[in-house]
Amino acid sequence: MSIYVGNLSYEVTQEDISNVFAEYGSVKRVVLPTDRETGRLRGFAFVEMGSDAEETAAIEGLDGAEWMGRDLKVNKAKPKEDRGSFGGGNRGGYGGGGGGGRSRY
């Protein structure tokens, strides 16, 4: 299981997150997703702790806490397949308004 950490500063590093979560136990892994096109951090992370008890303690201790000027959103990460059935998944971005780059005149 892993923990979802949202509303992060775009300046945060894996080391910053590891240090905060280390207060609640051993941090096995920190993943900071970046935007595919810009390479910029997306403002959330996933943290994997050494045990379920450590993850629960971290969630209870950090959810809603202010860190780096932001109120953290910390909860159990949902498995990818359950993340929502809003259709399309990662296929979006090409249809609709995507064809306006070339002028015919």
Curated annotation (Swiss-Prot):
InterPro entries linked to this entry: Nucleotide-bd_a/b_plait_sf (IPR012677), RBD_domain_sf (IPR035979), RRM_dom (IPR000504), SLIRP/GR-RBP-like (IPR052462)
Biased composition (Basic and acidic residues): 75-84
UniProt KW keywords: RNA-binding
Chain segments carrying region Disordered: 75-105
Database matches in Gene3D superfamilies: 3.30.70.330
Domain RRM span(s) in chain numbering: 2-79
Compositional bias ranges of the Gly residues kind: 85-105
Highest taxon of source: Bacteria
GO molecular function, one term: RNA binding
Transmembrane segment boundaries: none
Protein name: Putative RNA-binding protein RbpF
Organism name: Nostoc sp. (strain PCC 7120 / SAG 25.82 / UTEX 2576)
